[in-house]
Amino acid sequence: PPTDKAPARKGKRTVAGIHLSHPDRVLYPAPAITKETLAQFYESIADRMLPHIAGRPLMLLRCPNGVGSECFHQKHFRDYMPKGMHTVDIPEKSTVRKYAVIENVTGLVGLVQLGVLEFHIWGCREDEIEKPDRMIFDLDPGPNVPWAAVIECALTLRARLEALSLKTFVKT
């Protein structure tokens, strides 16, 4: 049966140049996925993931102690920024806020070190804040919504967008 404990492992504790504190901390309980395992996974898919998230302002879901513990959304950064990242100043009402932007795999793994479990990109690039080039429809079904209904919704949405000559693709 699945447990909340990951098997004890020796070995790599630095991933993409980022030292991982608590590398054996379980972030996802079943099956047990540790911070180190997640960092290694993102390092392995960085070439495919970075073209979609690098250079875009981010909103992050942070769960420093893993799923099931206290989580919070972070949009703004003031002081600490992991290597491989920078901030972009974006005006908001009467102030200017700093948003995180990933540059490379080091930044991606640096966010795992901070307990980031979800990356939500803006629909624009950091150098074209007022010119979105991407629109995302996030289909998060409620607990009582059957998967077949989600699929039907996605197919209907795709058909309507393509009728408007908009290119669509699935992103998970």
What label would you give each PLM region?
Residues G11-D133:
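Active-site loop/lid in soluble adenylation, ligation, and acyl-transfer enzymes
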Residues P1-G11:
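Intrinsically disordered, low-complexity regulatory tails
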Residues A100, V105-T172:
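Signature for HUH/AEP ssDNA processing cores
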